[in-house]
Amino acid sequence: MTLKERRVGDVSILDLKGRLVLEEGDDILRSRINDLVSEGRIKIVVNLQDVTYVDSCGVGVLIAKYVSVRKKGGDVKLLHLTPRSHRLMEISKLLNVFETFDSEERAVESFAVQRAK
């Protein structure tokens, strides 16, 4: 799996490509989010548009990083879930946990709305 990072204001967007699975993508995502949190960047959008497969380990990384970022006062939101990723999140009841978006603009704007509450 590859990961490219972009920033829109104070929001970090992580564009993933490939398989988010044990020993292929889990360490890459975990490490980058840990680095972002260390830098104080706790508004994170994970773009899953080009992710071809997610296994339970990949889901575990998303959950673990969601929890650790929330403890620091931030949030992790998901963008462009593929039908397969959406179904996996639905089955595992994670659509009730993560905010998901089909629009990058809305995902980024949601942090401003969240702060205003």
Set out the residue ranges of the language-model regions:
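Amphipathic alpha-helical interaction surfaces in cytosolic regulatory modules
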Residues: 20-98
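General small-molecule cofactor/ligand-binding pocket signal
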Residues: 4-6, 79, 101
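Residues that form or immediately flank small-molecule/cofactor binding pockets and catalytic motifs
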Residues: 8-10, 83, 105
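STAS-typified acidic loop motif
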Residues: 2-31
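A charged, well-structured terminal subsegment
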Residues: 100-117
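Short low-complexity stretches enriched in small and charged residues
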Residues: 1-5, 33, 55, 108
